[in-house]
């Protein structure tokens, strides 16, 4: 509670300090001090819960005011609620005391009950109708106190009775915000279900989400995020919820917020309720300042999501840079921007106690700069505004270019330039046709490329940047104007890395590649008139989820002088362009800070600007960076124009080429067109050089092509042989490129790039007659790399060229021959590409080199055309490397060294005058798990190279046939993709139709809503009009009532005047009745005394009746409880009786069965007795038989002796017969004896069994008798209880009869009093002696009438009570009948 008061009551004085001499009593939950001296009797009684004392105070002669207040304006109801005496609260509410009284702190009794967690008291007050929306001194309502005490039931009851949920206290805390501070999850969830405002904020504009983050409750944060709260809202200091999470160190909540932000719609707007200014001149500021580290959150998303975010902004060019570099490319001006970032302090600052939750947040300022450069390049038919910026910048599409940027395959922006007679050149027609094919191929192959990060320590990051920037050397220019022009076109690589952080830098893979690219600087030379004005344009596209780099460069050759010293100066000042890019694996590559910074410095440091001299060509360089649907396109175009001094703009041939890459490949194609014209009006050479370096997704392939300079052609045969020796060698090139992969550490990789790009130099140009053009178009179809190389050597006399174009408008024979050679070469290169390339190519790194240009002498056109067929052989090769899924982490030091050493071998051959100046093309690829560096060194003029080239030509012819088959397969795939595209178009059209239907429905619904709103507004207006009419009618009604009252008073006054007149007239008549008046006066006094006595009796009777009623109520409650108990016992007894009856029945059955058994046993006994008698009868017979047997034995012995003595044989035989007879007789006699013994044993056993059964039956019968006795006792008890209840009923009836008698007496008294009043009225009407007597009599009459009404009402109340008693009697009789029925049932069951 202290926190609530401290938060809400700023500046409010607390309670006064207690007096040390007074007795102090503290309540349980009230934080004030109580003084008994300040309290009244009613307050002490209420605080102690003494209800009877309060009753005596209110009923006595001097009733106490229930709303009396103490010294601090607290009533008895306040004290009862604080101490939780619900009986006192009910008593006070029944006595109709004030429920919404405010104490000294503006709190109602309901607030005090909720503050002290007295639920019973609060429920009583709410049911009685206490106001729930009163506000105390601190702005808290009853709902605030319920939320603070974390009592969910009270919160629910308050809201169900209509408490306002959005009230703010003086600290601007709603109940929801207070619940969040208390970390009570259940109350927060309940308030949110009751539609509490989840976007509420306190006085410092901290939202509910921010408070939940500071409290560290992830569950409450999850609840708020489900309510779609404003995640991007800011407090007074501009800090968002995300930054609160970062500053408080709550990582899991921070991750939860980031996941929610990613799930938000793709084009979020600033949802800050207060609103932020978006009208700054820097259009990227809303995106950058909306959330902390917005650039990082943008770059962490996929390219598709980043593109959608950027597309939602204004149509101006808006650019977002990387958060680590802090650079945003926009208009040419540079505006610094401050972004506050939260930084974690030490662990000691963040360790705080859980109760206080005080957190310290510090913010450090970081500056980011915004810088862009725009260059306008003007072509004959079109002006294009191209944006140029650093390699790690992202440019947003303008209104003009947004449609182009959103497509997967960009269409070439070069418009065809027609000749004088409206015919297009052969080269242009061929280029546009090939571009269409490549557009289709890239549509087929387009796939989504995942964006990975490279985590680099900051030290490494800065070192690389420094080493790059240190090698950028600016040479002196002849004029300041030229210097300014070149500075406009130069890349600002130094400003890229100003805001690198000291901690690790997480760089997306695509951004890391861009940072490693070299900033190119282009010279601008003064224009001179020339015979030709070609414009070369190159467009490179990367499909969905890939970088699309379009780079067109046209390099102009300065006018050369014949002196060798001049040639050396030009060689030293030649323009060196290099574009090494570094791809990073899907896994993070961790590099030290030092090595990382060195890489950047060494790369950008090699950019050198050559001095601007008088020349014939004027290059215009422009770069355009756009964000398509899911891709980043970089378009770089450079157009170089040269005119002859004599003939201005006769011919304008245009060469446009397009190179496309599949979905997961980055292709860099760089074309350089070198145009040179001699100061004379003779035909000038315009050589063109195109080179390509491609890297697959998981392999870096380096394909290097080098073209070697041909010696100056003379009519002699020796010079022709030299030129043949300088041709390219196919066989050696294939042998070197088809070797195994070379896995190099990362450091070696970096060094090789540095040395390669560092040693590329430009040879000086001299006067010549021929115009060789070399163009290359390379496409990567479905996981294959196609290499198309076209080289056309053109040598024309200026006069002949002008004549052919001006007169006939047709291309020359040399052009036709060159196109034929180009077709042958394309077939060979396609064949080689389909054989070798199997790996998946995802990213390309282009390294641009410029081959030296040789000075050529004038020669006839015919001779040059003949020699072109023999000498324009080229060598192309593609190395396929199987893709692997992981990159190797390579050290930076070895990486840079190896690249420097390999590039060191690439040197320019000495320049010689020649009629041909072929262009070179180089393609380098590096595999995924290693660095495959295959470099083709310059071939010197040898006879051995010619033989190898001639041997390689048949293999090219064989490759053509294979390439045709591959082309057919590709065309079939193209048709399938076209069909798929048609199906998708149909689905899109259907989706658009559905969208249009939904929009129509939405419009209809909006119209309906508007109509409903109008009707609601009309109804509200009608209600307001009715209320206004009621307010107008109210005073009229009051006036009418007042007039009626006045009329009634006037009538009464008239009547009184008439009576006075009658009384005055009767004064004379009543003068003789003075004695009777005195009697009447005495009688009045007696009546007054009697009335007072009656009042006392009525009061005593009321009190007695109340006491009796309370006693009766208590007795009735007790009887009801007893009846309930009896009913329960009866039910239990019924159950037991039924159980016992069933048991008894079973026992009876058993007994009957036993009786039958016993009867059978008795019969057996009788049989046994008969057998015993028979046995006894057999005993004498046995004795006699034994005697006979003994006698026979003795006789036998005697006879034997006699026979022995006599020895007569016949006598022995006779004796044997006699013995056998006697033996037989004995056996016959023994058999009945055995039978008799057996029969005698069986009845004895049966008798034993029968005795046991009888004993068991006796025990069972004893138990049954005991149970019967118990049931009889219970029946007696029930009868006794019934008799007691009957006695109580009789008592109640007697009491009711006595009450009726008393009521009858009271009624009789009332009648007598009425008679007396009537009699007194009659007397008063008769006498009417004086006015002084009349008015008191009227008052007495009224008083008596009121008393009579009260007595009558009391009688009615008693009658109602009697009716209630009668109803209760009937209920009791019914219960008694039930008892009787159950008792009878028990008796019957006991008897049965």
UniProtKB/Swiss-Prot annotation:
UniProt cross-references to SMART domains, sorted A to Z: ANK (SM00248)
PANTHER family for the chain: ANKYRIN REPEAT DOMAIN 36-RELATED (PTHR24147), ANKYRIN REPEAT DOMAIN-CONTAINING PROTEIN 30B (PTHR24147:SF52)
Keyword Transport applies: no
InterPro entries registered for this protein in UniProt: Ankyrin_repeat_domain, Ankyrin_rpt, Ankyrin_rpt-contain_sf, CC144C-like_CC_dom
Highest taxon in the source lineage: Eukaryota
Keyword Coiled coil (UniProt): yes
Span of the signal peptide: none
Region (Disordered): 1-21, 265-292, 558-587, 636-656, 671-690, 830-877, 904-926
Tissues expressed in: Expressed in brain, breast and testis.
Annotated Pfam families: Ank_2, CCDC144C
Compositionally biased residues, Polar residues: 267-280, 576-586, 830-840
ANK repeat segments: 72-101, 105-134, 138-167, 171-200, 204-233
Biased composition (Basic and acidic residues): 636-650, 864-874, 904-915
UniProt entry keywords in alphabetical sequence: ANK repeat, Coiled coil, Repeat
Source species of the chain: Homo sapiens (Human)
Name of the gene this protein is made from: ANKRD30B
Protein name: Ankyrin repeat domain-containing protein 30B
Coiled coil regions in record: 960-1168, 1270-1318
């Amino acid at each position: 509670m202290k926190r609530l008061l401290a938060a809400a009551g700023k500046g409010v004085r607390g309670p006064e300090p207690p007096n040390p001499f007074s007795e102090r009593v503290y309540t349980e939950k009230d934080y004030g001090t109580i003084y008994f001296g300040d309290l009244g009797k009613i307050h002490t009684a209420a605080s102690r819960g003494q209800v009877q004392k309060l009753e005596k105070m209110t009923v006595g002669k001097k009733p106490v005011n229930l709303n009396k207040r103490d010294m601090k304006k607290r009533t008895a109801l306040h004290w009862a609620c604080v101490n939780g005496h619900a009986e006192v609260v009910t008593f006070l509410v029944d006595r109709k005391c004030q429920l919404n009284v405010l104490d000294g702190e503006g709190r109602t009794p309901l607030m005090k009950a909720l503050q002290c967690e007295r639920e019973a008291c609060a429920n009583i007050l709410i049911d009685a109708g206490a106001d729930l929306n009163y506000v105390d001194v601190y702005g808290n309502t009853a709902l605030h106190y319920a939320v603070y005490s974390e009592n969910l039931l009270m919160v629910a009851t308050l809201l169900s009775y209509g408490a306002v949920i959005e009230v703010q206290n003086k600290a601007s805390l709603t109940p929801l915000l207070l619940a969040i501070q208390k970390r009570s999850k259940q109350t927060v969830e309940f308030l949110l279900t009751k539609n509490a405002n989840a976007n509420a904020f306190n006085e410092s504009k901290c939202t509910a989400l921010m408070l939940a983050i500071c409290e560290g409750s992830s569950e409450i944060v999850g609840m708020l995020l489900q309510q779609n709260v404003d995640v991007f809202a800011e407090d007074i200091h501009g800090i968002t919820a995300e930054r609160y999470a970062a500053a408080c160190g709550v990582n899991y909540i921070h991750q939860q917020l980031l996941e929610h932000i990613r799930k938000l719609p793709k084009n979020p707007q600033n949802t800050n309720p207060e609103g932020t200014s978006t009208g700054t001149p820097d259009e990227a500021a809303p995106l950058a300042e909306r959330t902390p580290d917005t650039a990082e959150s943008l770059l962490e998303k996929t390219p598709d999501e980043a593109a959608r975010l950027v597309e939602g902004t204004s149509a101006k060019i808006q650019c977002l840079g990387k958060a680590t570099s802090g650079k945003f490319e926009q208009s040419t001006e540079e505006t610094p921007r401050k972004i506050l970032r939260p930084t974690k302090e030490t662990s000691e600052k963040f360790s705080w106690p859980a109760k206080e939750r005080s957190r310290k947040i510090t913010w450090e300022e970081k500056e980011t700069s915004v810088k862009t450069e725009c260059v306008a390049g003007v072509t004959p038919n079109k002006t294009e505004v191209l944006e140029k910026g650093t390699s790690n910048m992202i440019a947003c599409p303008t209104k003009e270019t947004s449609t182009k940027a959103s497509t997967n395959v960009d269409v070439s922006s070069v418009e065809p330039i027609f000749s004088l007679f409206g015919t297009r050149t052969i080269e242009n027609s061929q280029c546009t046709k090939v571009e269409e094919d490549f557009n289709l191929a890239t549509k087929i192959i387009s796939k989504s490329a995942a964006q990975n990060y490279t985590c680099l320590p900051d030290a490494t990051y800065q070192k690389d940047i420094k080493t790059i920037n240190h090698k950028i050397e600016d040479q002196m220019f002849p004029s300041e104007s030229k210097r300014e022009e070149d500075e406009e076109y130069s890349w600002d690589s130094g400003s890229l890395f100003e805001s690198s952080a000291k901690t690790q830098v997480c760089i997306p893979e695509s951004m890391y590649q861009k940072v490693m690219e070299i900033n190119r600087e282009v010279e601008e030379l003064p224009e001179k008139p020339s015979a030709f004005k070609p414009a070369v344009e190159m467009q490179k596209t990367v499909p969905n989820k890939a970088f699309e780099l379009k780079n067109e460069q046209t390099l102009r050759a300065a006018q050369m002088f014949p002196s060798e010293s001049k040639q050396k100066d030009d060689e030293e000042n030649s323009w060196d362009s290099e574009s090494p890019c570094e791809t990073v694996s899907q896994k993070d590559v961790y590099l030290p800070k030092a090595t990382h910074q060195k890489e950047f410095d060494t790369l950008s440091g090699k950019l050198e600007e050559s001095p601007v001299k008088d020349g014939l060509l004027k290059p215009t360089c422009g770069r355009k960076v756009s964000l398509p649907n899911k891709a980043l396109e970089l378009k770089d175009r450079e157009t170089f124009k040269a005119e002859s001094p004599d003939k201005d703009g006769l011919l304008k041939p245009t060469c446009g080429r397009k190179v496309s890459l599949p979905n997961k490949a980055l292709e860099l194609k760089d074309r350089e067109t070198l145009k040179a014209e001699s100061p004379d009006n003779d035909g000038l050479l315009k050589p063109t050089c195109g080179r390509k370096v491609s890297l697959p997704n998981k392999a870096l392939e380096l394909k290097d092509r080098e073209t070697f300079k041909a010696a100056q052609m003379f009519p002699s045969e020796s010079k022709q042989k030299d030129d043949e020796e300088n041709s390219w060698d196919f066989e050696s090139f294939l042998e070197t490129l088809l070797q195994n992969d070379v896995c190099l550490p990362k450091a070696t990789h970096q060094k090789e790039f540095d040395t390669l790009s560092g040693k590329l130099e430009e040879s000086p140009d001299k006067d010549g007659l021929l115009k060789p053009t070399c163009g290359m178009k390379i496409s990567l179809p479905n996981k294959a790399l196609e290499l198309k190389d076209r080289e056309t050597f053109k040598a024309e006399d200026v006069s002949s060229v002008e004549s052919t174009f001006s007169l006939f408008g047709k291309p020359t024979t040399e052009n036709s021959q060159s196109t034929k050679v180009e077709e042958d070469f394309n077939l060979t290169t396609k064949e080689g590409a389909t054989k070798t390339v199997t790996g998946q190519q995802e990213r390309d790194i282009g390294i641009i080199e410029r081959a030296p240009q040789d000075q050529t002498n004038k020669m006839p056109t015919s001779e040059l055309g003949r020699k072109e067929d023999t000498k324009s052989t080229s060598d192309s090769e593609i190395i396929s490397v199987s893709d692997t899924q992981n990159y190797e982490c390579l050290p930076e030091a070895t990486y840079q060294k190896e690249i420097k050493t390999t590039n060191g071998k690439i040197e320019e051959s000495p320049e010689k005058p020649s009629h041909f100046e072929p262009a070179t093309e180089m393609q380098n690829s590096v595999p995924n798990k290693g660095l495959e560096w295959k470099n083709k060194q310059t071939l010197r003029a040898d006879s051995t190279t010619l033989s190898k080239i001639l041997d390689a030509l048949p293999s090219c012819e064989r490759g053509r046939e294979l390439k045709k088959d591959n082309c057919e397969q590709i065309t079939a795939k193209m048709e399938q993709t076209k069909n798929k595209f048609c199906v998708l178009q149909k689905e899109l059209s259907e989706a658009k139709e559905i969208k249009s239907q939904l929009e129509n429905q939405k419009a209809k619904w909006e119209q309906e809503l508007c109509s409903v709103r109008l009707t609601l507004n009309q109804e509200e207006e009608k209600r307001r009009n009715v209320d206004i009419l009621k307010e107008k009618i109210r005073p009229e009604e009051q006036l009418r009532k007042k007039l009626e009252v006045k009329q009634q008073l006037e009538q009464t006054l008239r009547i009184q005047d008439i009576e006075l007149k009658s009384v005055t007239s009767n004064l004379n008549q009543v003068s003789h009745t003075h004695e009777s008046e005195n009697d009447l006066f005495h009688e009045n006094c007696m009546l007054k005394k009697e009335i007072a006595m009656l009042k006392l009796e009525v009061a005593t009777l009321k009190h007695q009746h109340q006491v009796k009623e309370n006693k009766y109520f208590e007795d009735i409650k007790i009887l009801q409880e007893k009846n309930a108990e009896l009913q329960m016992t009866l039910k239990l007894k019924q159950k037991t009786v039924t159980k016992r009856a069933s048991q008894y029945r079973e026992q009876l059955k058993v007994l009957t069965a036993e009786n039958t058994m016993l009867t059978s046993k008795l019969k057996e006994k009788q049989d046994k007795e008969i057998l015993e008698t028979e046995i006894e009868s057999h005993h004498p017979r046995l004795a006699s038989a034994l005697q006979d047997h003994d006698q026979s034995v003795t006789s036998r012995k005697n006879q034997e002796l006699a026979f022995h003595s006599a020895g007569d044989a016949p006598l022995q035989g006779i004796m044997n017969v006699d013995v056998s007879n006697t033996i037989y007789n004995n056996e016959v006699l023994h058999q009945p004896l055995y039978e008799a013994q057996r029969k005698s044993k069986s009845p004895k056993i049966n008798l034993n069994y029968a005795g046991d059964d009888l004993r068991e039956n006796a025990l069972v019968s004893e138990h049954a008798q005991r149970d019967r006795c118990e049931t009889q006792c219970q029946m007696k008890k029930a009868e006794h209880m019934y008799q007691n209840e009957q006695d109580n009923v009789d008592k109640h009836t007697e009491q009711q009869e006595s009450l009726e008698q008393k009521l009858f007496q009271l009624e009789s008294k009332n009648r007598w009093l009425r008679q007396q009043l009537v009699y007194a009225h009659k007397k008063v009407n008769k006498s009417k002696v004086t006015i002084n007597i009349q008015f008191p009599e009227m008052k007495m009459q009224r008083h008596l009438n009121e008393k009579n009404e009260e007595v009558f009402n009391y009688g009615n109340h008693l009658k109602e009570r009697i009716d209630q008693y009668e109803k209760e009697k009937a209920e009791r009789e019914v219960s008694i009948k039930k008892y009787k029925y159950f008792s009878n049932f028990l008796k019957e069951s006991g008897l049965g």
